[in-house]
């Protein structure tokens, strides 16, 4: 049995609650900690994240396979902080799934929304589907990046469900721990944990099925990588999962900007 699948589903409600330690008062050696975590299980990586940042660690949940990240974090800390982006263009199935996860774990999910002062002029000037003509950058910038930037401005550390196998072009070098190259500032470094980075899609789904976790029903219809409804479609059996996102654009540009550090580090 792999190290990331050690907690039976029957123990979900009986596991002892984790008490958050206080965040570290002194900076840690980032390269040393990253190196020590490189071969650890996702649970060990999350445990280290909670040990160093306590209640200042936030979990990012996209309404897709990263329910695995939420499950692992919740089992370590029943008061885990989770946020999710509502772009206003998600599938109905994704909205229902976010509520299902909220109810399943009994947690609050901080749902982030676009700033209407930015969104309304875009829609008024260019309509609802300008991304098919102009590319997805402008729309994602308003619907995703700005709300996330606003959220992360008050956060010291966050954890994402990024995996290396999700995109050979932009995520193959995702580290388990890094300084976020997209949202850090010289005055305020933002620490980013990627506990699932070494897991494969098969391992993620093995975890979901073994523990009978809730999942987005779109997965049953051929959707693997799930984003906004107009920009996501099912993939064929031999296609990579990212081919279902922004299919009208060049393959190497298929990042919305939430993890722009992946592109910055490759520049």
UniProtKB/Swiss-Prot annotation:
Pathway: Sulfur metabolism; hydrogen sulfide biosynthesis; sulfite from sulfate. Binds 1 [4Fe-4S] cluster per subunit. It comes from Pseudomonas aeruginosa (strain LESB58). The gene is cysH. It is found in: Cytoplasm. One of its GO terms (cellular component) is cytoplasm. The keyword Nucleus does not apply. It catalyses: [thioredoxin]-disulfide + sulfite + AMP + 2 H(+) = adenosine 5'-phosphosulfate + [thioredoxin]-dithiol. Residues 1-29 are annotated as: Disordered. It is an enzyme of class 1 (oxidoreductase). GO terms for molecular function: 4 iron, 4 sulfur cluster binding; adenylyl-sulfate reductase (thioredoxin) activity; metal ion binding; phosphoadenylyl-sulfate reductase (thioredoxin) activity. Keywords: Cytoplasm, Iron, Iron-sulfur, Metal-binding, Oxidoreductase. Its cofactor is [4Fe-4S] cluster. Pfam families: PAPS_reduct. InterPro entries: APS_reductase (IPR011798), PAPS/APS_Rdtase (IPR004511), PAPS_reduct_dom (IPR002500), Rossmann-like_a/b/a_fold (IPR014729). GO terms for biological process: cysteine biosynthetic process; hydrogen sulfide biosynthetic process; sulfate assimilation, phosphoadenylyl sulfate reduction by phosphoadenylyl-sulfate reductase (thioredoxin). Its EC number is 1.8.4.10. Belongs to the PAPS reductase family. CysH subfamily. [4Fe-4S] cluster binds at residues 139-140, 228, 231. Its main location: cytoplasm. This is Adenosine 5'-phosphosulfate reductase. The active site is at 256 (nucleophile). Coiled coil: none annotated. Residues 11-25 have a biased composition (Polar residues). Catalyzes the formation of sulfite from adenosine 5'-phosphosulfate (APS) using thioredoxin as an electron donor.
């Amino acid at each position: 049995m792999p190290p990331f699948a050690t907690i039976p589903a029957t123990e979900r409600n009986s596991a002892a609650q984790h008490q958050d330690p206080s965040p570290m008062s002194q900076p840690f050696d980032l390269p040393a900690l990253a190196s020590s975590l490189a071969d650890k299980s996702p649970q060990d990586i999350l445990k280290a994240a909670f040990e160093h940042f306590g209640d200042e660690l936030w979990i990012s949940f996209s309404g897709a396979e990263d329910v695995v990240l939420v499950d692992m974090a919740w089992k370590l800390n029943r008061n885990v902080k989770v946020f999710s982006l509502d772009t206003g263009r998600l599938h109905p199935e994704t909205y229902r799934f976010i509520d299902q996860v909220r109810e399943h774990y009994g947690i609050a999910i901080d749902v982030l929304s676009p700033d209407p002062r930015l969104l309304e002029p875009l829609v008024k000037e260019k309509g609802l589907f300008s991304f098919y003509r102009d590319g997805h950058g402008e729309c994602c910038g308003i619907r995703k990046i700005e709300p996330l930037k606003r959220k992360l401005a008050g956060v010291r550390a966050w954890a994402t469900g990024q995996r290396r196998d999700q995109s050979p072009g932009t995520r193959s070098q995702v580290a388990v721990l890094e300084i976020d190259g997209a949202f850090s500032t010289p005055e305020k470094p933002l620490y980013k944990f990627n506990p699932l980075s070494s897991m494969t899609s098969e391992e993620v789904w093995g975890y979901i099925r073994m523990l009978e976790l809730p999942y987005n029903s779109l997965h049953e219809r051929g959707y693997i990588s799930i984003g906004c409804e107009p920009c996501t479609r099912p993939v064929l059996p031999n296609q990579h999962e990212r081919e279902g996102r922004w299919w009208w654009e060049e393959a190497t540009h298929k990042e919305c900007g939430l993890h722009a550090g992946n592109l910055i580090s490759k520049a």
